Amino acid sequence: VSKLFSVKDLEETRPGSKESKALTADWLQGEITICLTDEVRNEINLNPDQLKRQRGRDFALRFPTLVSPHEEVDNNLNALKLLLPKRPRRGDEADIRHLAHAIAGRAQFFVTRDSALLRRADEVRDRFGLSIVRPSELIVRIDELVREAEYQPTRVAGSLIRIGRVPSQQESDIVETFAQSENRSDFQQRLRAFLVEPQQVEASIVRDPDQHLLALLVYDRRTNHRLEIPIFRVADSYLGKSLTSHLILQTVLVAADERRATIKLSDPHLSESVERALQTGPFVRIGNSWIKFNLRTLETTTSLVIRLKSFEADTVEEREYLRAMIQTTTQSLLAKEARALLEVERALWPMKIVDLDIPIFIVPIKPEWAMHLFEKKMAEQTLFGAKPEIALNRENVYYRAAKPRVLSAPARILWYVSSSKKYQGAMHIRACSLIDEVTIGTPKDLSRQFRRLGIYEWKDILGIAKGHIDNQLMAVRFSDTELLNTPVPWKDLQHILAQVEGHRSQIQSPLHISNESFARIYSRGVQL
């Protein structure tokens, strides 16, 4: 049973009232009973404005009255008066009368936005067993019980960094860490407005293994075709840049999996580092927001133009952007400009243009490398997980022998994780990436050039060169890796290759495949 502190919180439109009104949401009605005390009705009757008095009485009829024996109320009043400050503020005595009725009526929660009452919450709970909480706090507590699994933090990119929904009693730490150029109380109020709608708004925090807050992001799903991110904050840390890029990439995949064609990042207080990452996202600045259109489809160039014309655009600027993209796609198709079409594909990632004229390869990779470069499910099978400074990168590098020199850029990769008794899920096509650059050089030159990328240490690179520092190696820089929702097993892969390519393959080295093979494998992997 919960008691609302003030009937005006529900009845009127005023700052903060939305937080209290959220307690009347349909999904909560089976979880809580909102009651009024006699004290609320007394306050209504004392209102000198006849119209407001009658409106208050009519509104109060919507809620049951908490039964509270008068003798117990009086006893509680005497005990509660000891909690009053030496110089009581206006309204303090009314507050304790509310509390006295709630305690006598055996309420479990006393719900209020009054900061003075909330400061006394520990004393009241310890002495009387009544929990004084904000509306947002109560709603999060209930949602934690209803959807317990969603509040259990999960690994980020297979590392020991974890992400999960904002749990109860975390608000002050979050505000302290992530309030930026805005007023802290304004930020706190914005955050609460999202926390009270957990059925449609998902607020998540990212923590490192030592429980330090690294990031806060809010997904607003109240519009069917759009995923809006009204809050996107990343704390300053050595992982800040790579974590930002990773969270942006994952946001795009979430929207695509939910078949939401538009992402709108509308946080008015983004840091400069987040804005830089969005530009390479690629998001575009339209008005005061950052927008990205995306598709979870395989398209021919012709069907893509038709698809773009069907997009829902909410503003004139968005329509102009789509019109320009349609024009670029059409012109590139006529001119057979593969690189220009690839840029269109990147803008609509994870959409794939199946008739794009770039090479496609199946590339074998050992599980030990895959788990750090992209394969989070394998990393989760280990005690220490993937190295976050590698796994969070949007781009990485993969080394192999320089021969056979079949790989080129730009190109697509389907990653085949080779056989291993140590890891579950080996011998599957598990991910798809784009090759951005292929470089041939000596171990020392490549190590120096790509030092900031990849999991490979000098001993690993030298090992690939069979211990000879003059041997030529190939460094493959790749990006925009997308894990397949349903990895394609060896047996199914061989069946597709036999049907389309006319032969099977042991996949001991990079294998060039056709657009049709790619379309079948990818469609199977992402369940199109």
Q: Over which residues does each language-model region extend?
A:
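A short, internal acetyl-CoA/4′-phosphopantetheine-binding micro-motif in the GNAT/acyltransferase core
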Residues: P230-L243, P268-H269
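A conserved beta-strand-loop-helix scaffold within acyl/acetyltransferase catalytic domains
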Residues: E182-L227, I231-V234
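Active-site neighborhoods of divalent-metal-dependent phosphate/nucleic-acid chemistry enzymes
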Residues: L66-V111, S115
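Acidic, PIN/NYN-like endoribonuclease modules and their adjacent C-terminal/linker elements
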Residues: E11, F109, S115-Q188, R192-L195, ...
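Short, well-structured N-terminal submotif of metal-dependent ribonuclease cores
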Residues: V1-L36, L46-Q54, S115
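Conserved acetyl-CoA-binding loop-helix of GNAT-fold acetyltransferases
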Residues: L239-A256
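Contiguous surface segments at macromolecular interaction interfaces
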Residues: A261, R276-E389, M427, V438-L528
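Conserved GNAT acetyl-CoA-binding A-motif
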Residues: A255-H269, S289
